[in-house]
């Protein structure tokens, strides 16, 4: 019997295993999943704060971070053709879509998605080996040989006709990822884009720890101070932390900080009043002054901003701590400018533990549209092992599930069919 082995039991790996089992002729192919964790899907259970934001209705190449957008297009088309949402519907998963296009299981439970996958894998006879750590993977004339250590610490050797590498990247080591997939891709001669934490918070050079825990609606702009240009703009809720900035819009900006191609001297500029231009905001501030006779700057922000945030902004504008009605009219233009151009420099992405996904990876031109590695027939790389990281909102799970489905189906197609036995004619 021919065998397909999937290395990694995360979203991409489970989808690959199930798609392969669904596509294989009955009794012709054994499908095996190896995962180092005590249970598969550990990271999947944590996605979407446990609700599993598994897809998005706005899938487009522009929603992904990669060094080669042109190479991404045919790959993303193949992933879209795998139709993850329709595939899940056929498995019995009912979903809902919110106003931002984010797709969730109707139950809002990531555990239900995992249980559904596990149930179908068991029904189709897929062997799942947990607590199994892959040590080496080698290619030979008959296919591939995998050396791994099982949960009891015993060495095990498996033979495979096709291997799907779904071991994730470096993001979220607490979920069992260790970057083996990308390291193995390099060992096979594959070229890698440098790895970096993607969709993560940002440390700033001078964090204001008094603001830790405060949230504010803002337009966040990533600047390249060396090139004097805007890299990207995101709107949403910013969370101030004791180390810098967080929140979905900040995490989105972190995706642009790829080593070698991102801004050399990045900075984030916050606009705390994006609905008003600077002239209108100046007028708004000036109109408040007659309402606050003899009042201190701390009173100025009542009804506008969190008082701690207002005090920090006042300090950033370098205005004196005097009654607001004693300040010159020009002060309100200065304050409006500070509120719309609050600069945070010295950016450093937080580490792998906080990152939601991995930027960089095996370059996309190294694989076919069905994510088969061009240098090794029967070897596939899916999900985070590839240089494709999605934005927040279900784009990464779309890529994980879709690339896994595409790989699983193609792996079955790639297997050499045994020659049919000749019919013996009766004499």
Q: Where are the model-predicted features located?
A:
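A glycine-rich dinucleotide-binding beta-alpha-beta segment and adjacent secondary-structure elements
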Residues: 130, 310-389
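Glycine-rich FAD pyrophosphate-binding loop
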Residues: 21-49
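Beta1/beta-strand and adjacent pyrophosphate-binding region of the FAD-binding site
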Residues: 1-12, 32
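Short hydrophobic core segments
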Residues: 5-7, 34, 134, 157-173, ...
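Glycine-rich loop(s) and the adjacent beta-strand/alpha-helix scaffold that form part
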Residues: 162-208
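A conserved short coil-to-beta-strand element within the FAD-binding core of flavoproteins
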Residues: 130-143
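An anion/pyrophosphate-binding glycine-rich loop and adjacent beta-alpha core
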Residues: 38-40, 45-46, 54, 58-61, ...
């Amino acid at each position: 019997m021919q065998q397909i082995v999937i290395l990694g039991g995360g979203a991409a790996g489970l989808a690959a295993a199930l798609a392969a089992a669904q596509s294989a002729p009955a009794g012709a192919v054994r499908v095996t999943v190896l995962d180092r964790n005590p249970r598969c899907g550990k990271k999947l259970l944590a996605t979407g704060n446990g609700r599993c934001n598994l897809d998005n209705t706005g899938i487009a190449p522009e929603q992904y971070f990669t060094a080669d957008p042109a190479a991404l297009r045919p790959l993303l088309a193949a992933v879209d053709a795998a139709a993850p949402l329709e595939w899940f519907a056929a498995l019995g998963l009912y979903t809902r879509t919110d106003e931002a296009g984010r797709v969730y299981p109707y139950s809002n439970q990531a555990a239900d998605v995992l249980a559904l996958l596990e149930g179908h894998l068991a029904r189709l006879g897929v062997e799942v080996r947990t607590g199994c750590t892959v040590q080496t993977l080698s290619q030979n004339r008959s296919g591939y040989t995998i050396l791994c250590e099982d949960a009891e610490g015993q060495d095990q050797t498996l033979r495979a006709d096709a291997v799907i590498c779904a071991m994730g990247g470096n993001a979220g080591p607490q979920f069992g990822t260790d970057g083996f997939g990308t390291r193995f891709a390099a060992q096979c001669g594959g070229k890698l884009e440098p790895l970096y934490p993607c969709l993560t918070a940002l440390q700033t050079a001078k964090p204001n720890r008094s603001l830790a825990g405060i949230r504010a609606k803002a337009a966040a702009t990533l600047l390249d101070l060396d090139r004097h240009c805007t890299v990207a703009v995101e709107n949403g809720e910013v969370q101030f932390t004791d180390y810098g900035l967080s929140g979905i819009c900040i995490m989105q900006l972190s995706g642009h900080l790829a080593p070698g191609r991102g801004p050399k001297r990045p900075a984030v500029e916050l606009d705390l009043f994006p609905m008003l231009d600077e002239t209108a905001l100046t007028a708004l501030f000036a109109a408040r002054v007659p309402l606050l006779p003899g009042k201190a700057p701390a009173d100025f922000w009542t009804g506008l901003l969190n008082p701690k945030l207002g005090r920090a902004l006042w300090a950033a504008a370098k205005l004196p701590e005097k009654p607001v009605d004693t300040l010159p009219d020009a002060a309100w233009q200065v304050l409006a400018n500070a509120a719309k151009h609050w600069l945070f420099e010295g950016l450093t992405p937080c580490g792998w533990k906080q990152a939601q996904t991995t930027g960089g990876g095996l370059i996309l031109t190294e694989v076919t549209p069905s994510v088969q590695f061009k240098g090794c027939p029967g070897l596939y790389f899916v999900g985070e092992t590839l240089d494709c990281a999605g934005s927040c909102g279900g784009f990464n799970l779309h890529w994980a599930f879709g690339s896994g489905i595409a790989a699983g189906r193609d792996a079955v197609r790639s297997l050499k069919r045994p020659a049919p036995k000749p019919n013996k004619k009766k004499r």
